[in-house]
């Protein structure tokens, strides 16, 4: 009998999955599903929270057996906004900010699809990484203009090109669904950018060309066994956050189904 190997990463939850739910509802659900790691969004803990509010938040999480593993995505347009994100992460005690340094389009548009990646702000964020010893994982948003935001770090390669010469704590939050929908093999991308991979968002899609077409994780088009195996093979040590925001809460069964599916894949990979 093969002895299962111990996988270095954990299954968590992207906070945005519960953007229509209160913190209490979110933590109760995570406890029910035996998920212990949460990437915190600011609708559950505002960026302007006081030290007392942050302490109360951490206690409430602990009471449900949940540990914040990161914060974000946080969209930052200025150096002051970036510094606020780092102060927030430091106060919460998390090692990574899922961040998106951006600037408006030339026509001044600030809508999600009109935002542009900002290498200039990334350079300042890189300095903050060194100052705070906190990682930044930049979230890719898809290269297809119909379903993503190609000018806002469309693919992991677009993040890499900006951060590769910056502080080693500047890296990637790989949205697996957008990566796959853009025609990339997510497992190969994980192996390629492993040295700067600091977070993963696990989503599956029903339409292989549409990175926004949500479905429960077990019934989509992405081969997640290969994704999980790649993460294990490269020694990825972060969390993998399940993200189902586009389809949830209309399909509440998708959350436990996805948790069970990914746990089964992790067990299969561990057993070789």
Predicted segments, located by residue:
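Generic hydrophobic, helix-prone segments enriched in Leu/Val/Ile
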Residues: 53-54, 67, 135, 215, ...
